[in-house]
């Protein structure tokens, strides 16, 4: 009888342990982001940072556990890059065609690129992703659309995120937006702009890192300072959320994109894949706030402030 009682207790403990583990597994989330770490001094090409340099990582205000911190470069870290150009920029953007062409031609040979244009709330591609610069540049042309033809650049970004021209989720998905950032459906600055929030959510869900090159549309509205300030601040929300970067010099168009694109190449060469686990409130994928502190005193760190967290059990299925 005593032996039977012991066996029964052992069986109950085993069942309870399994149930507890399953419950905790269901509440455990995991995620990954791209982190950029560039040297403070432009003459230096890279910074030596490791997982041990991560001081703190919090997801939704809770401590997370780092499970991987890997340099992203070489053939084992493919890059897919899309230029998303505002069709309302018109002929004035023609002065930058040579710099865009040079950037495409100088990217590593395993980088797949494409050019899309903002048209009526969509990302309209003129060609497929390709590692052949000549093929990519066939799609590059001076835009000639009317002011506001993009409708909202954030509609276009959402469309691109939801219809990315590849199913390769192991590749870094880089977007280079050329626009004034103005939402023509709401010209004022609204930090809760629903189209911007949707663009952020769609970008985060689909793993996009967004970079913004400010270029003012030709026309009356784009010459008014408060709309320009609104556009820049809205785009800053997108780049901060996705771990990218915003480039501008006041409200005027830059003389050349060359320093921006040079800095972008440097950033792409100094990126790391950060993987982590964290408690998850619900048993489905959630977009949460991310806070990362990295001990790199001689470097600039750009990490997204939003991240998609999946249930660990989902990844195991």
Regions inferred by a protein language model and the residue ranges of each:
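Scaffold/interface architecture of coatomer-like assemblies
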Residues: 21-317
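Positively charged n-region of N-terminal signal peptides that target proteins for export
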Residues: 1-4
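Bacterial N-terminal signal peptides
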Residues: 7-16
């Amino acid at each position: 009888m005593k032996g039977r009682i012991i066996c029964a207790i052992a069986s109950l403990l085993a069942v309870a342990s399994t149930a507890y583990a399953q419950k905790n597994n269901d509440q455990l989330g995991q995620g990954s982001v791209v982190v950029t770490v560039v040297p403070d001094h432009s003459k230096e090409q890279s910074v030596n940072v490791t997982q041990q340099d991560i001081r703190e990582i919090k997801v939704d205000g809770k401590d997370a556990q780092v499970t991987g911190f890997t340099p992203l470069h070489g053939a084992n870290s493919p890059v897919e890059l899309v230029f998303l150009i505002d069709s309302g920029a018109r002929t004035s953007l023609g002065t930058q065609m040579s710099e865009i062409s040079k950037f495409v031609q100088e990217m590593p040979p395993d980088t797949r690129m494409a050019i899309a244009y903002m048209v009526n709330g969509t990302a309209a591609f003129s060609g497929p992703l390709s590692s052949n610069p000549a093929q990519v540049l066939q799609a590059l042309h001076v835009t000639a659309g009317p002011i506001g033809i993009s409708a909202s650049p954030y509609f276009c970004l959402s469309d691109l995120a939801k219809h990315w021209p590849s199913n390769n989720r192991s590749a870094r998905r880089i977007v280079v937006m050329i626009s004034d950032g103005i939402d023509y459906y709401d010209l004022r600055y609204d930090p809760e702009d629903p189209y911007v929030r949707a663009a952020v959510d769609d970008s985060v869900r689909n793993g996009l890192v967004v970079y913004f090159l400010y270029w003012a549309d030709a026309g009356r509205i784009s010459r008014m300072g408060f709309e320009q300030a609104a556009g820049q601040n809205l785009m800053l929300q997108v780049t901060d959320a996705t771990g990218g970067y915003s480039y501008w010099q006041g409200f005027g168009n830059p003389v050349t994109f060359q320093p921006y694109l040079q800095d972008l190449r440097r950033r792409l060469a100094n990126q790391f894949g950060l993987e982590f686990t964290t408690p998850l409130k619900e048993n489905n994928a959630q977009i949460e706030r991310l806070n990362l502190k990295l001990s790199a005193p001689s470097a600039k760190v750009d990490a997204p402030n939003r991240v998609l967290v999946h249930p660990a059990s989902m990844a195991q299925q």
